[in-house]
Amino acid sequence: MSYRSIILLVLSTLNLVYQQGLIPGVVVTPAPIDVPGLHVLIVEESGDRNTVDKGQLSVLQTTLVKQEVVASGGEYRMYDANEPPVEEPWRTAMERPRTSLPWLIVSNPGKGGFEGPVPAGDGAIDATLKIIGGLK
């Protein structure tokens, strides 16, 4: 078996493991935004930035997440929970249920989706990029 075949097998296995939700803390669901392509939405309460976890705050303040999404040909938005957008698909995405803030929605029909709290703690930016990277 060639190295290329082994690498493809490993990558396929990792993709399957990721999509089956076998990586702790990451559950891939059907894409929550029914529009082709990668879409990433962060919902926050901007008035609470001084009380959110430092890791979550780093995700809210960094440009790395947006740069990664845009470089992948996707669309990125961040909205305040009290400031609903008018344009689709963001308006519909903002209407989805959430249990806390800040909240992350990653969607790519055909590849799956993620909805959950913005990762917290040390490595929050890397964890966010990992979620997005698995759904590109």
Language model segments and positions:
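Domain-start "cap" segments at the beginnings of catalytic or binding domains
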Residues: 3, 15, 105-106
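Surface-exposed substrate-engagement region within the catalytic domains
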Residues: 19, 68-98
